[in-house]
Swiss-Prot record:
Function according to Swiss-Prot or TrEMBL: DNA-dependent RNA polymerase catalyzes the transcription of DNA into RNA using the four ribonucleoside triphosphates as substrates.
InterPro entries documented for this protein: DNA-dir_RNA_pol_insert (IPR011262), DNA-dir_RNA_pol_RpoA/D/Rpb3 (IPR011263), DNA-dir_RpoA (IPR011773), RBP11-like (IPR036603), RNAP_asu_C (IPR011260), RNApol_insert_sf (IPR036643)
Pfam family of the protein (one): RNA_pol_A_bac
GO terms, biological process: DNA-templated transcription
Family: Belongs to the RNA polymerase alpha chain family.
Top-level class of the enzyme under EC nomenclature: transferase
Catalytic reaction annotation: RNA(n) + a ribonucleoside 5'-triphosphate = RNA(n+1) + diphosphate
EC code(s) of this entry: 2.7.7.6
Protein name as annotated: DNA-directed RNA polymerase subunit alpha
Gene3D superfamilies referenced in this protein's UniProt entry, alphabetically: 5' to 3' exonuclease, C-terminal subdomain, DNA-directed RNA polymerase, insert domain, RNA polymerase, RBP11-like subunit
Region (Alpha C-terminal domain (alpha-CTD)) residue spans: 241-350
GO cellular component terms given for this protein: cytoplasm; DNA-directed RNA polymerase complex
Organism encoding this protein: Mycolicibacterium smegmatis (strain ATCC 700084 / mc(2)155) (Mycobacterium smegmatis)
NCBIfam families, alphabetized: PRK05182.1-2, PRK05182.1-4, PRK05182.2-5, rpoA
Length: 350
C-alpha cells in the first residue's frame, strides 16, 4: 500500500471481555477487505476447548431423567453447552462432577484436571432434591468452530456415552465499520474499527492476534509467487517453516522458570506464537513479571531464532546482566534467584 504513514493499531477496552480496535490509515477499500477477513477468521478459526461427550451415572441415553434431579438429561446437556473451558492439552481430557443433594449444581462443582480451567463457575447445571445425586463424566477436547453431536459420536463408544454439540469458538461477537480518515491532504483513506467480544477463556486482544497470525500464514502463499522464478514453490521457505513450527510450540517447551511460566499462563499465553506477538511493554504490564523475566524470555526466544514484537534484531544474550551466555546459566546476582521460584509458585497457590 502506497501510504506515507504506516498503519497503526490501537485498543480501547469497552468491557471485561470486549474491546474496540482501530487500524488506520489504510488505502481506500482496504478497510472492508481487512475487516471482512478478520471478522470471518475470528468467528470461525480461533481454536478453543469444549465438551464433546458426557456420561451420567445410571443414564443410558439423553431421553430420560435422573432420580432426584429437577432437570431431565436433555436440559442438563443444554446447560453444559454453555460451559466455558480452556485446555492446554491437545489430547482429550476428562473432568468429573459429583454432587449430593439438596442444592444447586453449578460449573464450580466440576473438578478439572491440571491444564484445564472452567471460566464460568457460577453457570447453572441442575437442581437436586433431598435424595438427588448427580455424577457426570465430561470429555473436553480442543478444536475450531462448531461440531455437531453426530460427529462427536465415536465408533465403538461405551454404552451410556452421550455425544454433545461442541462450540469451540471462544469469540462471541465481531462487528466492524469503516470510516474515512485523513492522510496529509487526502481524506479518502480508510479507518477500520473492529469490535470484538469473547468468552472468559481468551481476551479480545489475543483473539485478534491469533486471527492475524492465521491470515498471515495464508496470505504468505501468495507472497511466495515470484514471476522471475523458474519454478514456483507454494509454501513457506525452510526458514519460515521452522519459525511457523516454533510458533505452535507450547511455552512449556521454553523451559522457563516457574515465575515467568506462571505469569504467562495466567495471562493466557500458551504458545510461542502468542508470546512473540507481545511487546516488552505488554509483558511488563503482567503482574509479577519484571525485567529479569523479560530478559529470560528474550534469551529463550533468541535460542529459537525468534524475538518479541519490538525486540531489536541486534539483541545479544551475552549483554544481559547476570547471564552467562557461554554456559547458559544465571549468576547469583541476577536480581532474583531463579532457583527460589518454587516459593513463588507456592505463594501463587495460596
Amino acid at each position: 500500500m502506497l501510504i506515507s504513514q504506516r498503519p497503526t493499531l490501537s485498543e480501547e477496552t469497552v468491557a471485561e471481555n470486549r474491546s474496540r480496535f482501530v487500524i488506520e490509515p489504510l488505502e481506500p477499500g482496504f478497510g472492508y477487505t481487512l475487516g471482512n477477513s478478520l471478522r470471518r477468521t475470528l468467528l470461525s478459526s480461533i481454536p478453543g476447548a469444549a465438551v464433546t461427550s458426557i456420561r451420567i451415572d445410571g443414564v443410558l441415553h439423553e431421553f430420560t431423567t435422573v432420580p432426584g434431579v429437577k432437570e431431565d438429561v436433555t436440559d442438563i446437556i443444554l446447560n453444559l453447552k454453555g460451559l466455558v473451558v480452556s485446555s492446554d492439552d491437545d489430547e482429550p481430557v476428562t473432568m468429573y462432577l459429583r454432587k449430593q443433594g439438596p442444592g444447586v449444581v453449578t460449573a464450580g462443582d466440576i473438578v478439572p484436571p491440571a491444564g484445564v480451567t472452567v471460566h464460568n463457575p457460577d453457570m447453572h447445571i441442575a437442581t437436586l432434591n433431598d435424595k438427588g445425586k448427580l455424577e457426570v463424566e465430561l470429555v473436553v477436547e480442543r478444536g475450531r468452530g462448531y461440531v455437531p453431536a453426530v460427529q462427536n459420536k465415536a465408533s465403538g463408544a461405551e454404552i451410556g456415552r452421550i455425544p454433545v454439540d461442541s462450540i469451540y469458538s471462544p469469540v462471541l461477537k465481531v462487528t466492524y465499520k469503516v470510516e474515512a480518515t485523513r492522510v496529509e491532504q487526502r481524506t479518502d483513506f480508510d479507518k477500520l474499527i473492529i469490535d470484538v467480544e469473547t468468552k472468559n477463556s481468551i481476551s479480545p486482544r489475543d483473539a485478534l492476534a491469533s486471527a492475524g497470525g492465521t491470515l498471515v500464514e495464508l496470505f504468505g502463499l501468495a507472497r511466495e509467487l515470484n514471476a522471475d522464478s523458474e519454478h514456483i514453490e507454494i509454501g513457506p521457505s525452510p526458514a519460515e517453516a521452522d519459525h511457523i513450527a516454533s510458533f505452535a510450540l507450547p511455552i512449556d517447551d521454553l523451559d522457563l522458570t516457574v515465575r515467568s511460566y506462571n505469569c504467562l499462563k495466567r495471562e493466557g499465553v500458551h504458545t510461542v506464537g502468542e508470546l512473540v506477538a507481545r511487546t516488552e511493554s505488554d509483558l511488563l504490564d503482567i503482574r509479577n513479571f519484571g525485567q529479569k523475566s523479560i530478559d529470560e524470555v528474550k534469551i529463550k526466544l533468541h535460542q529459537l531464532g525468534l524475538s518479541l514484537k519490538d525486540s531489536p534484531a541486534t539483541f545479544d544474550p551475552s549483554e544481559v546482566a547476570g547471564y552467562d551466555a557461554a554456559t547458559g546459566t544465571w549468576t547469583s546476582d541476577a536480581g532474583y534467584d531463579l532457583d527460589d521460584n518454587q516459593d513463588y509458585a507456592e505463594t501463587e497457590q495460596l
